[in-house]
């Protein structure tokens, strides 16, 4: 059996939907771990920059949009993932289609934007 481990992040401004997201994830994934993460306000923009691999200044749109407070990381396992092409922020890419589609759904639930992050593939 082929399985993959992925991460789902629900940023501070999406936390009002974290319980619904956890409930829904159980339909397609095994939840391995749920963690509440707190980054110091002083280092938040540096941590966010390292995470996304691009320099994000303090007070960036991303920071304001997602929040600088506590957030949740959810580690999941999916057995027998299915890869399909989807339009991503980097263009058309082959991604874990179930997880990618869930991310799009959760982003709608949280009011649009990027208050939910997931890995899209093993790359």
What does each of the following model-derived ranges do?
Residues 1-123:
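Non-catalytic terminal and connector segments of soluble metabolic enzymes
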């Amino acid at each position: 059996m082929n399985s993959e481990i992925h991460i789902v992040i629900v940023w501070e401004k999406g936390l009002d939907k974290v319980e619904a997201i956890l409930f829904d994830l159980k339909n397609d994934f095994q939840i391995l771990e749920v963690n509440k993460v707190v980054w110091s306000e002083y280092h938040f923009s540096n941590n966010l920059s390292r995470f996304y691999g691009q320099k994000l200044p303090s007070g960036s749109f991303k920071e304001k949009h997602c929040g600088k407070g506590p957030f949740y990381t959810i580690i999941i396992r999916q057995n027998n993932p299915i890869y399909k092409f989807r339009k991503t922020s980097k263009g058309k890419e082959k991604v874990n289609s179930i997880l990618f589609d869930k991310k799009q759904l959760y982003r709608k639930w949280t009011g649009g934007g990027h208050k939910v992050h997931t890995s899209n593939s093993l790359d």
